[in-house]
Amino acid sequence: MAFAPKTSSSSSLSSALQAAQSPPLLLRRMSSTATPRRRYDAAVVVTTTTTARAAAAAVTVPAAPPQAPAPAPVPPKQAAAPAERRSRPVSDTMAALMAKGKTAFIPYITAGDPDLATTAEALRLLDGCGADVIELGVPCSDPYIDGPIIQASVARALASGTTMDAVLEMLREVTPELSCPVVLLSYYKPIMSRSLAEMKEAGVHGLIVPDLPYVAAHSLWSEAKNNNLELVLLTTPAIPEDRMKEITKASEGFVYLVSVNGVTGPRANVNPRVESLIQEVKKVTNKPVAVGFGISKPEHVKQIAQWGADGVIIGSAMVRQLGEAASPKQGLRRLEEYARGMKNALP
């Protein structure tokens, strides 16, 4: 779904964004129309479901999940990686890849599916397979922009007792070992349940909040800045050009280009409009553009890279490797084989 705040003229947008140290218009405008809050009472809705659902998301918060059993134990702490292997901010990582003419490999997995011990191993495995950035989903009781594969993954994670606290505890142990940055992807309610300082302390480098209500954009953007976290925003084929410009100005780390209107999940083919969408975004920003939704085959990532994307995001197809396995051990083997195949398909 596309968010629907009042639009502004392109000239006023351009002039408002001249001051480099000021929050982008998308964020700054809301500070004059909403009472600032330290917690995040709303945000930028840039999903691809219906307009009615977008309106509902701006004023409602998903119900809390039912009481769940205690999460699986986190693996024992291991020695931190050497200093030269410590992860860098997302923007630095993407800039280094662009300078080399490389396309970023950005896999997504759900924390806690099937348990957090397996998630910790999956993070290490993906890092070893050459992931440039890892998106880690924090389960939410109403993952409404996601398709059946990720919804089922989220349900398994919640059933295993996965909570934000448990995810952050696991990340404190694992992120010192990783050479690539981790970006948390979750919905509004889980993100607002903890301070951003806790997330940064756990080794998180960025955030993606797909149902971020529009009126909380300024407060979240500002607090993310204060905690050296990069807030990645999404744009979709349904977003008008003036709104897309606002999003690209505000997004940090990279611009997340959703390839299709609809929910997550593998597609047989890449939307042919993605080529022109990439160029439209690149006309208004020099920030990296990463494409996600529906990508599941080596030929998909090759095509998207040829069209000029700076990164390729693979979610449901990654989640399926763990979710459809007979055991965590088998799932990790499947994940490694699949991840290496997708990584090797990129230039």
Curated annotation (Swiss-Prot):
Belongs to the TrpA family. It is an enzyme of class 4 (lyase). Mutant rescue experiments indicate the existence of a second tryptophan synthase alpha gene whose product might be involved in tryptophan biosynthesis while BX1 might be restricted to free indol production. The lineage of its organism: Eukaryota, Viridiplantae, Streptophyta, Embryophyta, Tracheophyta. Pathway: Secondary metabolite biosynthesis; 2,4-dihydroxy-1,4-benzoxazin-3-one biosynthesis; 2,4-dihydroxy-1,4-benzoxazin-3-one from indoleglycerol phosphate: step 1/5; Amino-acid biosynthesis; L-tryptophan biosynthesis; L-tryptophan from chorismate: step 5/5. The alpha subunit is responsible for the aldol cleavage of indoleglycerol phosphate to indole and glyceraldehyde 3-phosphate. In bacteria, tryptophan synthase alpha (TSA) activity is almost completely dependent on formation of an active alpha2beta2 complex with tryptophan synthase beta (TSB), and indole is usually not released during tryptophan synthesis. In maize, the TSA homolog BX1 catalyzes the formation of free indole from indole-3-glycerol phosphate, independently of TSB. One of its GO terms (molecular function) is tryptophan synthase activity. Residues 8-27 have a biased composition (Low complexity). Residues 1-53 form a transit peptide. It is found in: Plastid, Chloroplast. This is Indole-3-glycerol phosphate lyase, chloroplastic. GO terms for biological process: L-tryptophan biosynthetic process. InterPro entries: Aldolase_TIM, RibuloseP-bd_barrel, Trp_synthase_alpha_AS, Trp_synthase_suA. Residues 1-38, 64-89 are annotated as: Disordered. Transmembrane segments: none annotated. GO terms for cellular component: chloroplast; cytosol. Pfam families: Trp_syntA. It catalyses: (1S,2R)-1-C-(indol-3-yl)glycerol 3-phosphate = indole + D-glyceraldehyde 3-phosphate; (1S,2R)-1-C-(indol-3-yl)glycerol 3-phosphate + L-serine = D-glyceraldehyde 3-phosphate + L-tryptophan + H2O. Its EC number is 4.1.2.8, 4.2.1.20. Keywords: Amino-acid biosynthesis, Aromatic amino acid biosynthesis, Chloroplast, Lyase, Plastid, Transit peptide, Tryptophan biosynthesis. Tetramer of two alpha and two beta chains for the tryptophan synthase activity. Homodimer of alpha chains for the indole-3-glycerol phosphate lyase activity. The gene is BX1.
